[in-house]
Regions:
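Short coil/turn segments that connect the beta-strands within blades of beta-propeller domains
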Residues: 8, 14-15, 24, 64-65, ...
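Short glycine-/Asp-/Thr-/Trp-enriched loop segments that recur within the blades
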Residues: 2-4, 60, 106-111, 162-166, ...
């Protein structure tokens, strides 16, 4: 018996905690009713349990009751709740052992992934070429494809003109919304963010409360270096957005019923 050591990253779902180890292994503990521990059962645990089937994991991201993992080969593994197809397996089956996400056409394994992010029940994938894929629950258009139909395989995120997003630098997701920071343009100018999805609390930095069906530009003359979307829910979802610029300044927007905005 001892402490969990050599942890390099952590993630948390609604009632489940995850730890990524230096050697690429993943451990889970807490609630496991959707099989999100990845050990082929649904038994809860009050101590860390080693996930099966995965190795060489370099990133983890937890949704409400599911986990995505990025491995060193650039493929994405998923486990747990999948009722909205958020694991990218072209089905809605609950998954108790990690499986690899499929390509955009649903055939073969997806590779070339740089970053992963998860909302409540949707997933966002940043590819090495700067394009963004999304999938899963889409009731508030958070998948960024222009409609609110759920998608069970990775689907190309499009901008306001219906063209594929190609200039993405980093991604963040939370609740029913998505942020995408953008690379500088050809002249070296900062381009701010794309925002997508649920905006009922004004959490998308667009100075309104309308949901965004496609990746919508939010201009900034500062480089965005970190982003996060938080949410809580009892009878309704409440969301707050946070970004950090190149000068280390923090900006918050959205729900502030408990002082979430820090102002």
């Amino acid at each position: 018996v001892g402490y969990l050591q050599n942890v390099v990253a952590i993630a948390a779902g609604e009632l489940t905690s995850f730890a990524l180890m230096e050697n690429g292994e993943v451990y889970s503990w807490g609630y496991n009713s959707y099989g999100q521990f990845g050990v082929n059962n649904t038994s809860a645990s009050n101590y860390p349990v080693k996930m099966k089937k995965v190795s060489n994991i370099i990133q983890i991201s937890a949704g409400e009751d599911f986990l995505l993992m990025l491995d060193a080969d650039g493929s994405v593994w998923g486990v747990g709740a999948n009722g909205d197809g958020q694991l990218g397996l072209n089905n809605t089956n609950e998954i108790h052992l990690p499986q690899q996400m499929l390509k955009e056409n649903g055939s073969g394994i997806l590779y070339g992934v740089k970053e992963i992010a998860t909302g409540r029940s949707h997933s966002v994938i940043l590819k090495e070429n700067g394009t963004v894929l999304s999938l899963g629950y889409n009731g508030y258009y958070q998948v960024g494809i222009g409609t609110n139909s759920a998608t069970y395989i990775p689907t190309q995120v499009v901008n306001e003109s219906g063209e594929a997003v190609t200039d993405a630098k980093h991604i963040a997701a939370g609740g029913d919304a998505t942020y995408i920071s953008r690379n500088k343009d050809s002249e070296g100018n900062n381009q701010g963010l794309y925002v997508i999805g649920r905006n009922s609390n004004g959490n998308l930095f667009t100075q309104d409360t309308g949901n965004k069906r496609r990746a919508t530009k939010v201009q900034s003359d500062k480089d965005i270096i970190a982003m996060a979307l938080t949410f809580n829910h009892d009878s309704t979802i409440r969301q707050t957005g946070v970004i950090v610029d190149q000068d280390g300044k923090v900006y918050t927007v959205g729900y502030n019923g408990n002082g979430e905005m820090g102002n």
